[in-house]
Amino acid sequence: AIDGTSAISRLWGTPASYGTALQFAEYCRKYGKTHDMMAPFITNSRHNGLLFPEGYWAQHRPEHLTTEDYLAARWIAKPANLFDNDIPIMVSAAYLFTTPERAKDMQQKPVYILNHASSRATPRSLTPTLEEVEAETAKTGRKLYEGAGITAADLSFENMYDGFTLFHQFH
């Protein structure tokens, strides 16, 4: 038997958009922002996706997204519109982890992982509140930076992909 809210979320998985839409609505209210502020980020993300030849957008749907298209899209769970939600695609990835000593003779230069972290907080309800999300993302960020021995100023780019665009203001 599955107890508590897990009985809902673990059986079929939680509906993707509504929780983040609720959190984003609260974010907009708290900080005086609007859904429209996401348009430059969303259109730039699509543009960048089209620049990646191995990516889905470049291979299967090489179409630009305009600000007008984004702002006019139908609501899925207000304030999350069609373009704030991931599209259903099948994907897989494989990563090989080894030690620096074993990787030293490889043709391809290895990538070093400095740290990893995740958040395993249990929300008070089925959907975490904005305060819970902000606290957990801050905690995860601190773990990542401290474990890697770097700060945000040491980074030259940010590449947090998530097909659900409204997550990004929390990271």
Role assignments for model-derived ranges:
Residues 38-45, 155:
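Short, well-structured alpha-helical segments that form the helix of a local strand-helix-strand
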Residues 44-48, 161-164:
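A short structural micro-motif
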Residues 27-32, 140-154:
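Phosphate/pyrophosphate-binding loops at sites that engage ATP/ADP/AMP, CoA/4′-phosphopantetheine
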Residues 2, 39-41, 74-143:
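Condensing-enzyme catalytic core mediating Claisen C-C bond formation in acyl metabolism
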Residues 1-31:
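Flexible glycine-/small-residue-enriched beta->alpha junction loops
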Residues 125-130, 162-171:
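Short glycine/threonine-rich loop-to-helix capping motif typified by GTGT followed
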Residues 44, 51-91:
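Polyanion-binding loop/helix "lid" in catalytic or ligand-binding cores
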Residues 116-118, 156-165:
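A short beta-alpha structural unit
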